[in-house]
């Protein structure tokens, strides 16, 4: 019995070490998604003009999905999106942005106002999205009315931090343990439509945190 317990303890220790090593291979505030046979191609999302668009139109592309807001401390990241896409010479990368007003009401604009807000207010200075960046209609990413796409992403990609935030800043119910934590959280999708990585809003540094993961997925067949 003692030997069996010793072997079991050793096996558990090896598993813990393997898990710790795997975690250390990822930057802080980055999580790997769980494998799933379902893809984002099963979903339709609202556009700025009120119509619906199938995400199946993005087959074969590496996708960076991000929930955005105009009046957020992370809004400066918009200034990094266009250079990131310009440097993607093969055009494989697409950025899909989903405006959301659930975090301290930092996206109050109506759909028809969003692009002008970005152009003239924040980030301002005439900012317009690159041709490979698509800004969709407003959605909810948490709570009872979360969009099915975000329900799917949260089910298969673990939370990047143990604490979500202050309750009074979250404009939805109920609060879930795997909720989107704030504006500009990101999901990286491979060329077959599977979610692969989840990134905390602050895991950015002008896109340099995410760039190696994009390169990895672009190399995949």
Swiss-Prot record:
Residues 1-19 form the signal peptide. It catalyses: 2 glutathione + H2O2 = glutathione disulfide + 2 H2O. Its EC number is 1.11.1.9. GO terms for biological process: response to oxidative stress. The active site is at 72. This is Glutathione peroxidase. Belongs to the glutathione peroxidase family. It is found in: Secreted, Extracellular space.
